[in-house]
Curated annotation (Swiss-Prot):
Binding site for Mn(2+) 2: 14, 64, 455-456
Domain of life: Archaea
Cofactor binding mode and count: Binds 2 manganese ions per subunit.
Originating gene: gpmI2
Species annotation: Methanosarcina barkeri (strain Fusaro / DSM 804)
Enzyme Commission identifier(s): 5.4.2.12
Lineage: Archaea, Methanobacteriati, Methanobacteriota, Stenosarchaea group, Methanomicrobia
Name of this chain's protein: 2,3-bisphosphoglycerate-independent phosphoglycerate mutase 2
Length: 525
């Protein structure tokens, strides 16, 4: 009979940052008897989870993709944002053959170039200077028909930052060529990642058919009208920007038409660099066997992805992935360990794809468990999300005695934190606390151990103290790392997210591969 395994668990609280001040701090406000007890009884430390510690520009907040990638890699990896910034600075961006091919296609067909993506300075899914660089490039190449399809943020920026962003973008367009904003749409629609295809279809139809819930004479008015309807940036319904129809210098009775829609032979550059929320609308454009919704129109276009969104798609990629060798999952597999990755829908890609170095592949003896996220409009309506279901399932898996290593993500503090609803975020923290209490009790019975940490901050800063408005973005605050288990380990040193994987390997008695430059957090006597 095979001896039952005593698992090592890596438990990631998405959005669990540390901030001393209690005002606007859902983590400090919540009743968390289990976490309080763990922090009192167990060794713990702080980890840097933002900026240069995770391969981002100095001072930039972390995010889930970057956090999980860094945790799994065991090293600091220059993130796509940083890679693209460097290419702009050294000029390689403007010589990128994929961009140049898209421009050549437009010139050869006398067609249009469409630049679509999140028009945000947040730096999580996209970065406004990248769009600016594209506009400078097309100005240099003297393209006449250039259109922007602006997705609005409201999560990685304040809920009403888009109006100012759009004004600045409009001014930049006037200074650098003649690009026009053709549509605006909240990311809730254009960047859904949970196969809520009705949302994606609204954005897709706006881009391809010029059909949307609303129209406006310009992008600034589109955003202002949305605010008047009670919509914040994330939830702005797709809106077509229209222009008056002039025939023989006379304005016709029909009065207006869309500024532009995506047509056959056009080029499209999707300038988001983060994959998870770029996939669905990309699939709608490029997949022959797409079945998410009925496409009334499917234009044949030259479609460029800024980075690799889906390795199964044969599309041009401006910045292809850099392969990471010997990430945590690979090392565990090579040593014959059986591992489990478990999360709900919102963070499933993070404990699989991103933790595995940005690759879809599943390693030998790597089991995966997806718990569906609740089908609701916003997670403040159900702050516990699917945490209780995840906990029930992971306890069952622990008790099975099958696994050596279990990686679990609780999405609550991040996803509810993004809503900006303080009371809901407090409930989210309390739900996770109940879950961790149950899990560590079972681990204790089985002789298991756990590292409990986070990928970035969020719920600890729910109010912008300068404006008094809800704070919906991530933070650059440090995160905690708690060790639960073997009493021989007395202390952890402060470190970075890249130190988590080397710590796990030391706990398992596995040599750290040379590619991992992070260092174990365990303090030796």
């Amino acid at each position: 009979m095979t001896q039952a395994r005593r698992p090592l668990m890596l438990i990631i609280f998405d959005g669990w940052g540390y901030r001393e001040a209690k005002e606007g701090n859902a983590v400090m406000t919540a009743r968390t008897p289990n976490l309080d007890r763990l922090e009192k009884e167990c060794p713990w430390c702080f980890l840097k989870a933002s900026g240069e510690a995770v391969g981002l520009p100095k001072g930039m907040m972390g995010n889930s993709e970057v956090g999980h990638l860094t945790i799994g890699a065991g090293r600091i990896v220059n993130q796509d944002l940083t890679r693209i910034n460097i290419s702009i600075k050294n000029g390689d961006f403007f010589k990128n053959p994929v961009f140049l091919n898209a421009i050549s296609n437009v010139k050869a067909n006398a067609s249009s170039l469409h630049l679509m993506g999140l028009a945000s300075c947040g730096g999580i899914h996209s970065y406004m200077p990248h769009l600016h660089a594209l506009l400078k490039l097309v100005q240099e190449k003297d393209l006449k028909k250039v259109y922007i399809h602006a997705f609005l943020d409201g999560r990685d920026e304040p809920p009403k930052a888009a109006l100012g962003d759009i004004k600045k973008l409009d001014a930049f367009c006037k200074e650098h060529g003649n690009a026009k904003i053709a549509t605006v749409s909240g990311r809730y629609y254009a960047m859904d990642r949970d196969k809520r295809w009705d949302r994606t279809k609204l954005a897709y139809d706006a881009l391809t058919r010029g059909v949307a819930p609303y129209t406006a004479p310009n992008a600034e008015t589109a955003v202002s009208n949305a605010y008047s309807r009670g919509e914040t940036d994330e939830f702005v319904k797709p809106t077509i920007i229209t222009e008056q129809v002039i025939t023989e210098q006379v304005i016709t009775e029909q009065a207006e038409k869309p500024v532009a829609t995506v047509q056959d032979n056009d080029s499209v550059i999707f300038f988001n660099f983060r994959a998870d929320r770029a996939r669905q609308i990309t699939w709608a454009f490029v997949k022959d066997d797409f079945d998410g919704f009925m496409r009334e129109k499917r234009p044949e276009v030259y479609f460029v992805c800024m980075t690799q969104y889906d390795e199964t798609l044969e599309v041009p990629i401006a910045f292809p992935p850099i392969k990471l060798e010997n990430v945590l999952g690979e090392v565990l597999s090579k040593h014959g360990l059986i591992q489990l990755r478990i999360a709900e829908t919102e963070k499933y890609a993070h404990v699989t794809y991103f933790l595995n170095g940005g690759e879809e592949k599943r390693y030998k003896d790597e089991d995966r468990c997806l718990i569906p996220s609740p089908k609701i409009a916003t997670y403040d309506l159900k702050p516990e999300m699917s945490a209780y279901e995840i906990t029930d399932e992971v306890i069952r898996r622990i008790q099975s005695g099958k696994y050596d290593v279990i990686v679990l993500n609780f999405a609550n503090m991040d996803m509810v934190g993004h809503t900006g609803i303080f009371e809901a975020a407090v409930k989210a923290v309390e739900a996770v606390d109940k879950c961790i209490g149950r899990i560590v009790e079972v681990l204790k019975e089985k002789g298991g151990v756990a590292l409990i940490t986070a990928d970035h901050g969020n719920a600890e800063e729910m109010i912008d103290l300068k404006t008094g408005e809800p704070h919906t973005a991530h933070t650059s605050n440090p995160v905690k790392c708690i060790y639960f288990g073997n009493s021989e380990i007395k202390a952890l040193r402060n470190g970075k997210l890249c130190d988590v994987a080397p710590t796990i390997l030391e706990l398992l008695g596995i040599p750290k591969p040379q590619e991992m430059t992070g260092k174990s957090l365990l303090v030796k006597d």
